[in-house]
């Protein structure tokens, strides 16, 4: 499988599998069963049996080496790269690249990347930035801040704080990003981090939103 571009690694007790068909590192080996069923190197009369597949899966898991640098690789190899459905955009090379096992993405984008015409870029700039913030310098700062956040140029790649007055436009722009990058980007109101004397906990109920990049 490694000859076909697959890779297996272990971190903190979890096994991660890079499958070229998916392009990212996913936990678990459940889908190995499909490969076992189709593998010509395995005995034809045994490769489809569940108990045999269970044993093979456990054996494969035991052979996977632990990588103490895995979490660091997730951060550093995806630096200045933005995940899309059809590949990742490299902000340094300024082009779309194919997913590969040397780049440790754990999530894939929900939309395809496609170069846009200048008139589309101008429309986005005028409506979502200049039209919201009203000042070219502020708009440029906000655009660059979002770009750096999406490309990993922040210490914590999970959370990016935007500070501003009510009705300043920050909600509009973050909602636009959430709609575009559905699988990676979510908005979370700062008040959800505040302690509240109630029978519920808004921060706890919304903790899944922080899982976006």
Question: What do the PLM-derived regions correspond to, one by one?
Answer:
Residues 49-88:
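Extended, Lys/Arg-enriched charged tracts that mediate electrostatic binding to polyanionic substrates
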Residues 6-22, 26-30, 76, 88-211:
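P-loop NTPase catalytic core of nucleic-acid-dependent motor ATPases
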Residues 16-52:
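Short, small/acidic-rich helices and loops at N termini and domain boundaries
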Residues 1-5:
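Intein-associated homing endonuclease modules of the LAGLIDADG/DOD-type, together
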Residues 33, 37-41, 57, 61, ...:
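Generic solvent-exposed, charged/amphipathic alpha-helical segments
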Residues 9, 44-52, 64-72, 137-141, ...:
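Residue-level signal for secondary-structure boundary elements
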């Amino acid at each position: 499988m490694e000859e076909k571009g697959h890779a297996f690694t272990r971190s903190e007790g979890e096994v991660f599998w890079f499958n070229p068909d998916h392009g990212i590192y996913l936990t678990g080996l459940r889908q190995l069963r499909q490969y076992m069923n189709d593998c010509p190197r395995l005995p034809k009369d045994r490769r489809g049996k569940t108990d045999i597949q269970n044993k093979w899966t456990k054996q494969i898991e035991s052979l996977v080496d632990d990588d103490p640098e895995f979490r660091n690789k997730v951060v550093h190899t995806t630096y200045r790269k933005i995940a899309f459905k059809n590949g990742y955009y490299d902000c340094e090379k300024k082009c779309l690249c194919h997913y590969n096992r040397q780049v440790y993405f754990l999530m894939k984008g929900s939309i395809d990347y496609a170069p846009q015409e200048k008139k589309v870029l101008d429309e986005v700039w005028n409506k979502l930035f200049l039209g919201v913030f009203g000042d070219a310098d502020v708009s440029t700062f906000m655009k660059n801040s979002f770009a750096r956040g999406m490309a990993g140029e922040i210490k914590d790649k999970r959370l990016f704080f935007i500070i501003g007055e009510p009705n300043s436009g920050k909600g509009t722009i973050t909602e636009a990003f959430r709609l575009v990058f559905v699988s990676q980007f979510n908005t979370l109101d700062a008040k959800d981090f505040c302690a509240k004397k109630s029978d519920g906990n808004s921060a706890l109920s919304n903790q899944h939103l922080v899982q976006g990049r």
